[in-house]
Amino acid sequence: MTAMLILGVDPGLNRCGWGLVLSEGSRLSHVAHGVITPSAQQQLASRLHDVFEGICAVIEEHKPDEAAVEETFVNSNARAALILGQARGVALAAAARRGLQVAEYAPTTIKKAVVGSG
């Protein structure tokens, strides 16, 4: 049975959540988690840079085998969806920079997996 360390990212510009789980067969165990919180006083480019650097630091420290990033949820606020998409883009770029394979999941799929309904 091969163990695999997986980094999950819930992208956001105000708060970007991340978590690491170790997958061993059908068993998952928590390894670490955290939140990257760029200053709201910074300009957009600086905040995106903080998210990118934060995810790169997590990858450097924990050396995950793969990553999973939540897809953007599009609602009636197009501007918010575009900004979230940019945060998601830097999360994908950080994983790609480290050569990680990235799986992408819809928010409803993640919610169903975690709480049983979506």
Please give the residue ranges for each predicted region.
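Phosphate- and other anionic-substrate recognition elements at nucleic-acid/protein interfaces
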Residues: 1-118
